[in-house]
């Protein structure tokens, strides 16, 4: 598989290392955030992997879609535009797979959280909140992974209806609000936790990333899957689609 990387930052370099270490895959081209992106630059590619920033992705995604090459996107911060972009992908007969986090471990965390949120829903004595920690260089908060985790709770526990990112001084948290707190500290790669609490006990679910290898290898595996999927059934996909296929194999 010939891969074009869009983004040459820390994640892009990690992905390049994994691709180059593989006998089956090769880096076809690497584009920096500042490079001009047109559909033609992707000629000869079997897959595109985008790890840039929101503004760069929004400036480039139309060219990536128009190229007809399947696109794996790890850039976060554009969730509100996802329905629109998914429509554009489907209308063009192209393929795109988006995930806020490609780590297999963190996606097991999502599925465990999903089940926990569902199980405690009938029992009002259990409350739930989320927290995330990242290095001081991470600009967005909460992280895309934390937002995905929060959505899992909202989708599976009707007692929680809205996400609260920051508490206002003097205002109490309402019972239907899900607090998602953020910490920026040192060089932390990423820690995501769900805390379920009652008067009797506390349950904690935590995923801790030790390095970027899990994210990068997951993105490459997702690109391999999407390249095959594109040939049979083009469309807009998420990590859940890939994992459902992977776990059922």
Swiss-Prot record:
(S)-2,3,4,5-tetrahydrodipicolinate binds at residues 135, 144-145. Its main location: cytoplasm. The keyword Amino-acid biosynthesis applies. The keyword Mitochondrion does not apply. The active site is at 134 (proton donor/acceptor), 138 (proton donor). GO terms for biological process: diaminopimelate biosynthetic process; lysine biosynthetic process via diaminopimelate. GO terms for cellular component: cytosol. NAD(+) binds at residues 32, 74-76, 99-102. GO terms for molecular function: 4-hydroxy-tetrahydrodipicolinate reductase; NAD binding; NADP binding; oxidoreductase activity, acting on CH or CH2 groups, NAD or NADP as acceptor. Gene3D superfamilies: Dihydrodipicolinate Reductase, domain 2, NAD(P)-binding Rossmann-like Domain. Keywords: Amino-acid biosynthesis, Cytoplasm, Diaminopimelate biosynthesis, Lysine biosynthesis, NAD, NADP, Oxidoreductase. It catalyses: (S)-2,3,4,5-tetrahydrodipicolinate + NAD(+) + H2O = (2S,4S)-4-hydroxy-2,3,4,5-tetrahydrodipicolinate + NADH + H(+); (S)-2,3,4,5-tetrahydrodipicolinate + NADP(+) + H2O = (2S,4S)-4-hydroxy-2,3,4,5-tetrahydrodipicolinate + NADPH + H(+). It comes from the Bacteria. Pathway: Amino-acid biosynthesis; L-lysine biosynthesis via DAP pathway; (S)-tetrahydrodipicolinate from L-aspartate: step 4/4. It holds the Pfam family DapB_N. It is found in: Cytoplasm. Its EC number is 1.17.1.8. PANTHER family: 4-HYDROXY-TETRAHYDRODIPICOLINATE REDUCTASE 1, CHLOROPLASTIC-RELATED, DIHYDRODIPICOLINATE REDUCTASE. Catalyzes the conversion of 4-hydroxy-tetrahydrodipicolinate (HTPA) to tetrahydrodipicolinate. HAMAP family: DapB. Belongs to the DapB family. This is 4-hydroxy-tetrahydrodipicolinate reductase. The gene is dapB.
């Amino acid at each position: 598989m010939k891969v074009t990387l869009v983004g040459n930052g820390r994640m892009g370099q990690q992905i390049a290392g994994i691709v180059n270490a593989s006998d089956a895959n090769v880096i076809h081209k690497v584009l920096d955030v500042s490079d001009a992106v047109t559909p033609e630059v992707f000629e000869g590619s079997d897959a595109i992997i985008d790890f840039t920033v929101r503004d760069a992705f929004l400036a480039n995604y139309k060219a990536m879609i128009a190229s007809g090459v399947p696109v794996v996107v790890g850039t976060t911060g554009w969730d509100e535009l996802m329905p629109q972009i998914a429509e554009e992908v489907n209308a063009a007969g192209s393929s795109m797979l988006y995930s806020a986090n490609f780590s297999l471990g963190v996606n097991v965390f999502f599925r465990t959280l999903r089940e926990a949120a569902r199980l405690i829903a009938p029992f009002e004595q259990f409350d739930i909140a989320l927290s995330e920690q990242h290095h001081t260089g991470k600009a967005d908060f909460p992280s895309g992974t934390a937002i995905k985790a929060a959505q899992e709770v909202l989708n599976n526990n009707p007692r929680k209806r809205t996400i609260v990112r920051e508490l206002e001084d003097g205002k109490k948290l309402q019972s239907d609000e899900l607090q998602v707190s953020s910490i920026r500290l040192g060089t932390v790669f990423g820690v995501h936790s769900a805390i379920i609490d009652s008067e009797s006990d506390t349950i904690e679910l935590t995923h801790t990333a030790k390095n970027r290898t899990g994210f990068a290898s997951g993105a490459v595996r997702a690109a391999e899957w999407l390249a095959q999927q594109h040939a049979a059934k083009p469309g807009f996909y998420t990590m859940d689609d890939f994992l459902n296929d992977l776990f059922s194999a």
